[in-house]
Regions:
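C-terminal hydrophobic helical "lid"/dimerization subdomain
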Residues: 248-292
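Short glycine/proline-centered loop/turn elements that form peptide/ligand docking sites
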Residues: 70-74, 81, 169-179, 209
Length: 292
């Protein structure tokens, strides 16, 4: 089978598509033929930085595909599934034509989406769910999401609105303002200087931007960026954890028409270097999908 691997850390040129042995499906595991995956910030960071499992390593966290062998009573051959694999910690990369994962990581794919769209949901959606859970938001609270046009930020806007939270967004470019409004945000701006002072009960920071002046005293602050936390009492990082339960809840919202995903570009796996270049250039409003 083909897989996307790195032998050294570096730029997009470090990515290699090569033949590797097919994985075996053991007891309690499910073997999935990959239809699509996506690019996430952790993927280019793992490629570029000296982090992650021993090399050579297969990259990728998101998975959408079809079961081709099962050592689990929960999944049968032919089932459409999605999953998130914590590649950095486990070494189980999903950028491969066949992926074997523990059964507890998989959930049935949304019925209302093609698998190439469903691939956008696992890491970004799980990250948003778990970060918002940390904030313990109440109906009527006012939330600011930074990086609201990104995959995580855009899903967070929608999820918070579903919970009855008033959501505003900070984006990096003027052209991203209207798309974020369409996701349900109230006020959206690309200028930090436009943010009202001491107006938000909570901040979900996906972009590493200093917006502490906009937070009420004692407000909640959760970040998934690589930047250091601001000097705010109780400020916390949120590190995503594998959770089929969270993923199943997201699937339910998608199939109910209450949560939508966004795709910016599709690339065949043979163009993975180009996909990385486009992703790192920024400015996209939606996910970059890899097709297998």
């Amino acid at each position: 089978m083909r897989a996307v691997q790195i032998d050294v850390h570096g730029g997009p040129e470090a990515l290699v598509v090569r033949e590797v042995p097919d994985p075996q499906c053991g007891e309690g595991q499910v073997l999935v033929r990959t239809v699509a995956s996506t690019l996430n910030p952790v993927d280019w960071k793992t490629r570029a930085w000296d982090v992650g499992p021993a090399l050579p390593a297969t990259l990728g966290w998101d998975l959408a595909g079809v079961v081709v062998a099962s050592g689990s009573p929960e999944f049968a051959v032919g089932d459409r599934v999605i999953a998130m694999s914590a590649q950095v910690a486990t070494g189980r990369g999903t950028w491969a034509e066949l992926v074997a994962l523990p059964e507890h990581l998989l959930t049935p794919a949304p019925k209302s989406l093609a698998l190439v769209e469903a691939a956008t949901l696992p890491l970004a959606g799980t990250t948003a769910v778990q970060a918002l859970d940390k904030l313990r938001l109440q109906r009527g609270d006012r939330l600011l999401v930074t990086g609201a046009a990104g995959a995580v930020g855009g899903l967070a806007v929608q999820l918070a609105r579903q919970a009855g939270v008033e959501v505003d967004g900070l984006v990096s470019r003027p052209e991203h303002v209207e798309p974020v409004r369409e996701l349900g945000a109230g006020t959206v701006t690309h200028l930090v200087s436009d943010l009202p002072e001491r107006a938000y009960d909570a901040v979900f920071d996906t972009a590493g931007v200093d917006v502490t002046a906009a937070l009420v005293e004692g407000g909640g602050y959760v970040s998934v960026s690589d930047e250091p936390l601001p000097d705010v009492p109780g400020a916390a990082k949120s590190y995503v954890q594998e959770s089929a339960k969270d993923l199943a809840a997201l699937v339910e919202l998608v199939d109910a028409g209450r949560l939508r995903v966004r795709v910016a570009e599709y690339h065949p796996v043979s163009e993975v270097r180009t996909a990385h270049e486009r992703f790192e250039a920024g400015g996209l409003s939606g996910k970059v999908v890899l097709l297998f």
